[in-house]
Amino acid sequence: MEATTTVARWTWGRDLEGAPAVESGVGACLRELLTAHQVLHSHRLMVGTPRMSVSVHEAGKKNTYLFRGETQPTVADAPVEAAQEVARRVHEAMSSGEIGSVYAHIDSPGDVLLGDDFRREPGLFRLGGSALLGYVGVDLATRTDFWLPYDLKGRAQPDVYAANAPRLSAALRDLSEALDSDTDPDDPTCFAKPNETGAENYFDEGGNARDVWDSFERHPVRGRAW
């Protein structure tokens, strides 16, 4: 099942001590993002050539962009070289001004294991990257419940969980290693409680998985959002 808002999110981040201003901005953001994408691609949780939405904010000016657009690398399977290539194109297209924060994200289909076959799911994850003042961060979010023991309606899905939860857990572990940062589960959402290895359902006092779909998705009053 897929919700209209985030089911679970995980984050990573670190300081880039001693990095020059340019390297700690656009280039660093894209390098971390594409490094993370390569990890997810290896687990088939993101598939295809990444198409990135990139925003470069001007320092000290609210809602002012030096660059805002979509781009994708031509270099495959080499995140550092791909990030350098895309960063160079972004810098060439940027307006003049001091770089403030940099944000980028990838929305990508991924493969879910159902029975003996993989099924392609559009928008399985959103992968985000950011850079500001020498700090780089990455976040991974999903609106789906393939990683939970019970679906969003509280129904047991042991086969789906057994097939896909270990894939997510392995990806989170590999992301921590690739990004040189501990996996930090984000705050619980109304659908699930993320942890370092995946996510957990909510349960009522009787020990039954809660039907969070009926509570929050039956009559949604919002559009699709992350």
Where are the regions a protein language model picked out?
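Acidic, proline/glycine-rich low-complexity IDRs
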Residues: G134-W226
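Structured alpha/beta or helical-core interaction and ligand-binding surfaces enriched in interleaved
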Residues: M1-R155
